Amino acid sequence: MALTKAEMAEKLFDEVGLNKREAKEFVDAFFDVLREALEQGRQVKLSGFGNFDLRRKNQRPGRNPKTGEEIPISARTVVTFRPGQKLKERVEAYAGSGQ
């Protein structure tokens, strides 16, 4: 099950005490700042969580799965996420607990 922006705003409402409008604006602003930084080619480092980076991928050969025809996959920039050590440890501990 995925965590949505609406659920994040609801958590802020419940746990931090922001009203619902403020919580939604906070979540939207957070993602806007992340998006803007990445659009400017900057790395985003969230201490204790992980890093968002831009990675350049070169053009490469691909294949149309329906026809088998070779087609070029164009060069592009992709966003990658590398989890931080603390996040890895917490996820591994949760996964190991059998939940």
Swiss-Prot record:
GO molecular function: DNA binding; structural constituent of chromatin
Domain of life: Bacteria
Keyword Electron transport tagged: no
Database matches in CDD domains: IHF_A
Gene Ontology CC annotations of this record: cytosol
A Pfam family annotated for this UniProt entry: Bac_DNA_binding
Transferase recorded as keyword: no
InterPro entries, A to Z: Hist_DNA-bd, Histone-like_DNA-bd_CS, IHF-like_DNA-bd_dom_sf, IHF_alpha
Keywords of this entry: DNA recombination, DNA-binding, Transcription, Transcription regulation, Translation regulation
Any one of the GO BP annotations: regulation of DNA-templated transcription
SUPFAM superfamilies recorded: IHF-like DNA-binding proteins (SSF47729)
Signal peptide stretch: none
Its biological purpose: This protein is one of the two subunits of integration host factor, a specific DNA-binding protein that functions in genetic recombination as well as in transcriptional and translational control.
HAMAP family listed in its UniProt record: IHF_alpha
Assembly, per entry: Heterodimer of an alpha and a beta chain.
Family membership noted in the UniProt record: Belongs to the bacterial histone-like protein family.
Name of the molecule in the record: Integration host factor subunit alpha
